[in-house]
Amino acid sequence: MMSIEIVIADYQNPAQGNDLLMLLDGYAQDPMGGGEALPPAVKASLLAELARLPHAFTVLAYVDNKPAGLINCFLGFSTFAAKPLVNIHDVVVSASLWGSDQYYIG
């Protein structure tokens, strides 16, 4: 039986940081993400920069203990609704899971 784990990423956790960078870089290299790898300078600074932002958070998904997806989010505020909101900046699913229904939880 498969296992699914969803966690709020700790930007200072080396394993979670590596998983975040690997998933995001995979997305960046896909045509949907621009078709180019993240620049080395971005890879070197992204985790520290995200950690400095109190309104940033990343949710990581693991399937069978392997990184399967992420969502990068930023807290904001809607002036039209006068309420807080979550801006979803990146949504990534590992290419190995694209088109697969073996993980359907319905």
Model-assigned labels for residue ranges:
Residues 48-60:
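A short helix-loop-beta-strand connector motif used in the catalytic cores of GNAT acetyltransferases and
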Residues 76-78, 96:
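Short coil/turn motifs at secondary-structure junctions
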Residues 58-60, 66-75, 87, 92:
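Conserved beta-strand in the GNAT
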Residues 91-99:
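A short, internal acetyl-CoA/4′-phosphopantetheine-binding micro-motif in the GNAT/acyltransferase core
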Residues 78-84:
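A short, polar/charged loop-to-alpha-helix boundary motif
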